[in-house]
Amino acid sequence: MVRNLKIAIPNKGRLQQPTLQFLQSVGIKPLASDDRALIVPTSWEGVQLVMIRTEDIPNIVETGATELGITGHDYVIESSADVEELIKLDFGRSKIVLAVPQTWRENSVDELKGKEFRVATKYYNIAKEYVRRRELNAKVVKISGAAEVMPSLGAAEAIIDVMSTGTTLKLHGLKAIDVIMDSYAVVIGNRNWIKNDEADRINLLLTMMKGAIAAKGKKMIFMNVPDNKLDGVINSLPAMLAPAITRLSRSDIWEVITVAEEDILPEVIAKVKAAGARDIVVIDIEKVVK
């Protein structure tokens, strides 16, 4: 019987939906009949999703309870878990910032030197290291809820928290004066995953994930080209779009296949059509496996 591989993913929050969408692009779709289920079978036989708090995922993966996990780079750093970041994903981008009241005259962290203040944060370890490194006279107050409201409540004067656009900070009368680190979603694994009995299956999962990432934003273009137009069509393609060329059963027609980024697709189609290509078909690419 095949042992289930487990992937820990966020059970809620800003990373949950992008994570599920990414996994579906890989071909891993949850099959839970109950939204409250915490261990969920998937469309990929032998692969289960485990719904866990985002901040707990690094520690869970470190123990080996799940083979892989998807979480934020910020939580990997905060947890100090002994895990390996295997794939950097293209969602969940944010910054961890130091924010202070807009009424403060200080606009940089250097201007805070010598000033006593409290800073509320759920990133306790990151904050402690930051305060030490920047030689600030600040007391770190650990919280688990919304940091933005803490200055208004009088629980702290400043916060260290995640920022995507800065809108929430402004809404609460705060301004970011320093970026502590950039964050993004990552696929993580136990340091010993390569020694795992299921290493081949794990590696296949990672390969398919990388393939889905590589395919994002790319389109495959098929076109028929008369023999006397072939050179013109080939020369009209951007240099990076090296095409595959096959002579069809009609000896005077060639099939040309190429791949283009979605943002230059209209330009490519216009050029090849003007050069003599016809019967142009464009399809999505699900994965590019290298």
From Swiss-Prot:
Keyword Transferase carried by entry: yes
Catalytic activity: 1-(5-phospho-beta-D-ribosyl)-ATP + diphosphate = 5-phospho-alpha-D-ribose 1-diphosphate + ATP
InterPro entries membership: ATP-PRT_HisG_long, ATP_PRibTrfase_cat, ATP_PRibTrfase_CS, ATP_PRibTrfase_HisG, HisG_C, N-reg_PII-like_a/b, N-reg_PII/ATP_PRibTrfase_C
Cellular component GO terms, alphabetical: cytoplasm
Top enzyme class: transferase
Cofactor: Mg(2+)
Activity regulation, short description: Feedback inhibited by histidine.
GO MF annotation list: ATP binding; ATP phosphoribosyltransferase activity; magnesium ion binding
Keywords: Amino-acid biosynthesis, ATP-binding, Cytoplasm, Glycosyltransferase, Histidine biosynthesis, Magnesium, Metal-binding, Nucleotide-binding, Transferase
Pathway involvement of the protein, from the record: Amino-acid biosynthesis; L-histidine biosynthesis; L-histidine from 5-phospho-alpha-D-ribose 1-diphosphate: step 1/9
Subcellular location: Cytoplasm
Enzyme Commission number, as recorded: 2.4.2.17
GO biological process: L-histidine biosynthetic process
The UniProt record lists the keyword Flavoprotein: no
Protein purpose: Catalyzes the condensation of ATP and 5-phosphoribose 1-diphosphate to form N'-(5'-phosphoribosyl)-ATP (PR-ATP). Has a crucial role in the pathway because the rate of histidine biosynthesis seems to be controlled primarily by regulation of HisG enzymatic activity.
Family: Belongs to the ATP phosphoribosyltransferase family. Long subfamily.
Name the record gives this protein: ATP phosphoribosyltransferase
Organism this protein belongs to: Saccharolobus solfataricus (strain ATCC 35092 / DSM 1617 / JCM 11322 / P2) (Sulfolobus solfataricus)
